[in-house]
């Protein structure tokens, strides 16, 4: 079995935080945990204030998350961002136990972040850790979605710390209760499209992220079928064969067939659905000739495309186009 490399994403922000404070990085034994884990635990052990935890969180940038950061930047909407984050947390981030989405009254949702603590940490260390995660999450939201993203409220658990620093730092109403960090915002924002959305780059980033991450993301996205649908949606012209798609997914063809059968569909059915949706979009939103649309969708003959379109819609391509003009 090939062991996937776990990238040490956290080293750079920790290094920059200490550099700006003229604090030397101590040496760590080679057999210790990852360098960033060792350095972070060392920082926590220094007894810095809760405000310093908030400051450290601002040092985390999208680029510090590697190809996962690229996937976040190019995701279609906020809902997809959360799916990527949940998969990332399960595989890479040992500081966070879980990220959950909970609907609330008044058409709002809450993003709950459950935090892990080291057994030896005291209240001050726990507060520092909570503040780092709250601040880094807030910065990630602002970097991805813009400073106008409407966060309506924030909950930050307090472990005997100064409560006066939070509202000024976040410029938000902040509550202090429970055990989770909670960001609240209008539910319809889950469908908000990112200005940086790019389906092709999103799919490319996922191929670089490793098999374990993709397996977790597939679960978050609702199965292999939806993963393939998103992949096909990112392709501007003729759809690939099952063999090519299987290579992209880093699976063999037989595994893809079996997994799709378990989900009650076939690759051909998924491609057929994708062709139908793209054909309708091209006929409605462009003046591209029908024979060119047939080529784009991968049909060897225009007659085959016309026959398929009538099967899908009960209309000819001409009838369909004329009915909307």
UniProtKB/Swiss-Prot annotation:
Going by the entry's taxonomy, the superkingdom of the source organism is recorded as Bacteria
Q: Which residues form the signal peptide?
A: none
Question: A Gene Ontology CC term for this entry?
Answer: protein-DNA complex
Q: Which GO terms describe its biological process?
A: positive regulation of DNA-templated transcription; quorum sensing
GO molecular-function terms, A-Z = DNA-binding transcription activator activity; DNA-binding transcription factor activity; transcription cis-regulatory region binding
Q: Boundaries of each HTH araC/xylS-type domain copy?
A: 226-323
Note one Pfam family from the annotation. Answer: HTH_18
Q: Which UniProt keywords apply?
A: Activator, DNA-binding, Quorum sensing, Repressor, Transcription, Transcription regulation
Q: What else is known?
A: Mutation in vqsM resulted in loss of proteolytic and elastase activity, significantly decreased expression of lasI and rhlI, which are responsible for acyl homoserine lactone (acyl-HSL) biosynthesis, much reduced swimming and swarming capacity as well as decreased capacity of killing C.elegans.
Role this protein plays: Transcriptional regulator involved in both the repression (at least 99 genes, such as mexR and algU) and in the activation (at least 203 genes, such as mvfR, rsaL, vqsR and rpoS) of regulatory or putative regulatory proteins which are implicated in quorum sensing, virulence and multidrug resistance.
Q: What is this protein called?
A: HTH-type transcriptional regulator VqsM
Species in which this protein is naturally found:
Pseudomonas aeruginosa (strain ATCC 15692 / DSM 22644 / CIP 104116 / JCM 14847 / LMG 12228 / 1C / PRS 101 / PAO1)
